[in-house]
Regions:
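Short, acidic/small-residue loops that bind anionic groups at enzyme active sites
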Residues: 106, 124-139
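Structural beta-alpha unit
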Residues: 72-103, 121, 141-156
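Acidic, proline/glycine-rich short linear motifs
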Residues: 36-61, 145-155
Length: 156
């Protein structure tokens, strides 16, 4: 069973990525995994759950909405929580563990677009070795020119 993974980020980004992922999952009968990353406050406690704040009411409401979106598309959906120290390491480990073929990830903006492009390139290289495609929903400089979309390579 193919797996499409969506990293939970801000509500708008996650909703847009989720709609795109659901459309892809419905067309390919893939399973959708929503990856909820929680930064570990103490790397020594990683994986123990100690020191991780409980979900807020707003987060619970968001997860309910995300589940309803997946149900509207008729897509199998699951939520996967994960503690992490570095974002790139967590994304790579999640893809490797769950054998995801597609990952929608929100790589944080940094002051320099060159640095962000390098980070995206590096993450793409890691994921490529795992046979996983990365989609980031990058926006052009003018926000009014942007709409959420995915360009898929031609099937050979």
């Amino acid at each position: 069973m193919a797996i499409i993974m969506v990293q939970v980020s801000n509500r708008l980004w996650t909703t847009q990525a989720l709609h795109l992922a659901c459309a892809l999952a419905r067309g390919s009968h893939a399973h959708l995994v929503l990856l909820h990353l929680r930064r570990a406050k103490n790397p020594g406690l990683l994986g123990t759950g100690i020191g991780i704040d409980p979900l807020t009411d707003a987060e619970c409401d968001d997860f309910t909405e995300y589940r309803l979106i997946a149900e509207d598309y008729g897509v199998r959906f699951s939520l996967q929580p994960m503690e992490y120290v570095t974002l790139a390491g967590a994304l790579t480990q999640a893809v490797e563990t769950l054998e995801a073929g597609i990952l929608f990830a929100d790589v944080p903006e940094h002051g320099h677009s060159l640095w962000r492009r390098f980070q995206n390139w590096q993450l793409r290289q890691r994921l490529s070795s795992l046979h996983c495609h990365l989609y980031t929903l990058e926006q052009p400089p003018r926000a009014e020119d942007w709409s959420p979309s995915v360009t898929m390579p031609a099937i050979k």
